[in-house]
Amino acid sequence: MGSCGAVGSVRARYLVFLQYLGTDFNGVAAVRGNPRAVGVLNFLEEAAKRLNSVDPVRFTISSRTDAGVHALSNAAHLDIQRRPGQSPFSPEVVAKALNTHLKHPAIRVLKAFRVPNDFHARHAATSRTYQYRLATGCSWPNQLPVFEQNVCWALQTEYLDMAAMQEAAQHLLGTHDFSAFQSAGSPVTNTVRTLRRVSVSPGPASPFVLPEGSRRLQFWTLEFESQSFLYRQVRRMTAVLVAVGLGILAPTQVKVILESQDPLGKYQARVAPARGLFLKSVLYDNFGPTS
C-alpha cells in the first residue's frame, strides 16, 4: 500500500468517516483566501498538521456539502507521508490524533481505515443517502424549539399531504435526466442519475424537545438514495415535493417537471433551506463507519 516520495519514506492513504453540524461552516470544502469563511476541511487540515507528514495533508472529500448542510457520516481520503524509517500510522492512531487536535466541537472523526494508494473517496463510493427534515405546525419561525433550530425546515402550515408527496416521489425513482433539479454553477455535463430509493415518512423530534413543546409540531423525514447526486438536486427535489404536500402542485406535475429538463422553471428553481439537509451515509464495498 505504500509508495516512496522522499527517499526511504512511505506514503500511506487513509479513508476517514466524519460527521459535522454544518451551521457554522461555509460548506465542507476548505476555503482559501477568505478569512471570514471557513470549511470543515480547514479544521481537519489544521489538525492533520500534528501528524507531521513530510508533505502537507490534504483531504479529498467524498461528497461536497453546502454551507449549513450537516453530515451524519461523510467520508474523505488523505495521504500521510512519514519520515524515512518511520512506520505508517495505524488507522486508530490517525482517527484519535485528528479528534484530539480538532479545534471545533461540531466536527468528529468517526473511524479511519488504511486503503490502497489508488483508492478515491469520491469515485469508489457505491451509495449516498441524504435525509431532509421538515417540521409542520409552526405559526412563526421562532416557535421552533431551541434544540430543533438549524436542523429542520419549519413550515408555517399545519398540514402536509403525505400521500400526495409519496405519490409524487415515485415519479423521481429510477434512471432519469435530472437536469431540471440541478442548480447553476456545476461543471457536471452528464445529468443522468439513478435514484434508487425515495421515501416520505413521519420522523422523530429531537429527544431534547419537551413533550409540551412539541405537541403542536409534527416532524417529517424525506430520504433519497443514489450513487451520486447533482448540485443541489436533493434540496430542489425536496422543495418540489413540499409544494405537492402544500397543494401547490399535483403529484403528476412532478413528472412533467422532471421531463422538462428545465432547471429555471417556476417550481423546480426553488431550493429548500440548507439547514434541514443531512448527508446520512456514504457507502463503500469494504469500508464503513460501523465496520
From Swiss-Prot:
The active site is at D66 (nucleophile). It holds the Pfam family PseudoU_synth_1. GO terms for molecular function: RNA binding; tRNA pseudouridine synthase activity. Its EC number is 5.4.99.-. One of its GO terms (biological process) is pseudouridine synthesis. Keywords: Isomerase, tRNA processing. It comes from the Eukaryota. GO terms for cellular component: mitochondrion. It catalyses: a uridine in tRNA = a pseudouridine in tRNA. It is an enzyme of class 5 (isomerase). Substrate binds at Y130. This is tRNA pseudouridine synthase-like 1. It comes from Mus musculus. The gene is Pusl1.
